Amino acid sequence: MVQKIIAAFLIFLSANSFAIVVTEEYLSTLASNWSSLEPAGAYDFIPEDLSYEAYMNPDFLAKLDEAGKKLNNTLEGKDIALPGFMVPIEFKGTDVSKFLLVPEAGQCIHVPPPPLNQTLLVDTSGEPTKLRDLYRPIIVYGRISVGSQSFDIADSGYTITDAVIETLSFSDEANINNIEDNND
C-alpha cells in the first residue's frame, strides 16, 4: 500500500513539473558553475597527488573545513544560472517557499552536509515553486547575494532571489552520445 502511495506521488510530481531538455549545446551555454562559488585560491593547498593518509590528517581536514567556509564576495548582486538538487526547508503541501540548492542529489539528507560555499538558499516565498523529485536535477536562475544563514539540516553561504526554477531532463540523444563516447 505504501509503495502505491509513493508511486502515485512521484507520478504526480513528474506530471506537474516543467522540464527542459539538456543537450551538450545547452550545457555549454551555462556560464556559471559550482566552482565559481569558491573564492580564487581557496583550495590551492590540496596537492594533485593527495593520498588517503594525507586526506585523513586532522590538520588537512581542518584546512578543508575552513576553505569550505570561504565565500566569493565578487558574486554579490550578480545574476546566476546554477544546476543542482532541491532540498526543501519551508513548504506547505507541494508548494515550496524555501529550499537549499546543493550540487549532488541526497546532500543534507546525510551528514556531513556540503560546505557553506556549496549550499545556496533559494527563496521563492513570493511565488512558491512546486516540489520536485529530490533526485531529479533542476536549474535555478536568479540574483545571488553573499551571506550565511543557518538551518536545521545545513548552513547556506549564498541566497538566490527572484528565482526561476526549471526541471532538467536529459535527452535520449545526449544519453546515447555519452554512452558511445565512453565506449570508444
Pin down the residues of each PLM region.
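Sec-dependent signal peptide recognition
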Residues: 2-8
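N-terminal signal peptide c-region/cleavage motif recognized by signal peptidases
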Residues: 14-16
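OB-fold and OB-like single-stranded nucleic-acid-recognition modules
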Residues: 19-184
